[in-house]
């Protein structure tokens, strides 16, 4: 199983490539929060934010494997799950194990962070189910994209909360407004990246 999972990550979730980007993403969000409140983030806050965010993005990959399994089997049979390299059940077990680690890290920093953690998981769960209206969403690509990209501000909220929540900063006045603008920007940036990622040349369409 270990060898198969290693082969899977190389194709669908390259640890080094994704890890560097996620580390920069998580650390910058935590540091921004500290900058806005006029302090410095703790090393523990940065470490927890980066590791938990890494877990989020892996779980999003697993969620996508489940959500897109029917289409992948039909149109992209060369991918790891359709061709039988790993099973959805095996990926679920790994994702649950990652979730246990996320809870442990979160509680080690501040138990109140369980709120933002559960919020991300809740959105991820309904997103995997296409908000229970898959046919309706697929006919409305803009709404589809925005509903899925809405998870990005929630992930950013968790990352910033790793700093401001243990520091006892309330979300009000200038701090809250600036943080809100940052979260909105993360939604816009995520949407732009998603549009670029899903834009295919005509000869690559299936």
Q: What does each of the following model-derived ranges do?
A:
Residues 1-206:
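Multi-pass alpha-helical membrane architecture of UbiA-family
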């Amino acid at each position: 199983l270990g060898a198969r999972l290693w082969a899977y990550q190389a194709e669908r979730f390259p640890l080094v490539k994704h890890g560097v980007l996620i580390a920069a993403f998580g650390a910058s969000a935590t540091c921004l929060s500290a900058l806005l409140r006029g302090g410095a983030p703790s090393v523990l806050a940065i470490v927890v934010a980066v590791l938990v965010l890494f877990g989020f993005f892996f779980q999003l990959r697993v969620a996508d494997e489940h959500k897109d399994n029917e289409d992948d089997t039909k149109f992209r049979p060369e991918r790891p799950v359709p061709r039988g390299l790993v099973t959805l059940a095996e990926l679920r077990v790994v994702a649950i194990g990652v979730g246990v680690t996320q809870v442990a890290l979160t509680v080690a920093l501040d138990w109140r962070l369980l709120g933002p953690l559960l919020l991300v998981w809740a959105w991820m769960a309904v997103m995997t189910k296409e908000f229970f209206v898959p046919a309706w969403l697929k006919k409305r690509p803009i709404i589809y994209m925005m509903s899925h990209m809405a998870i990005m501000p929630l992930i950013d909220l968790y990352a910033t909360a790793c700093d401001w929540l243990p520091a006892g900063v309330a979300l009000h006045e200038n701090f809250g407004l600036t943080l809100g603008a940052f979260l909105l920007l993360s939604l816009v940036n995520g949407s732009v990246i998603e549009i670029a990622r899903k834009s295919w040349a005509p000869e690559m369409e299936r």
